[in-house]
């Protein structure tokens, strides 16, 4: 969600990310640390059930809009390599998984979406706020709705050559054999002249 970039407080990489492979060469102890991530059950079905564990690495990222702000980078067991790029930014105030991770590792929780347009000075969140609202604490996005902020931030990232608009579909394979039994029928016409038509 590009609208929540001002609330980013960490970057998380999949243990299978190519940057992690490069780090293993320079940091021999990293392999031992990676074993602690308990990667046995990290598939899409189990990812919400497992304990979120991370390894902080000695690199930092520069915030795309705040050049003087650096963001710590972790290797985390809840980031999957086969979805997107295998790297995500964490916005703890607006994603429960990120919120839990930030609490565990004592990271900043910066509220950037609120029901009201007013700026919030103190963070009193007890859980992530995941509803829509207005952008706050977000520089040039302040006062915009979530949808407006998404559009503005994507355009700014494209203008700065830091990103581009993309859509990732999460479609799963599914069989049609039970479609008639479980759901809407699949229209098939049996024509004596032309054969089966779908």
Task: Give the role of each language-model region.
Residues 2-109, 113-114:
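NTP-handling and nucleic-acid-processing catalytic cores
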Residues 87-198:
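Residue patterns forming the tRNA-binding/recognition surfaces of aminoacyl-tRNA synthetases
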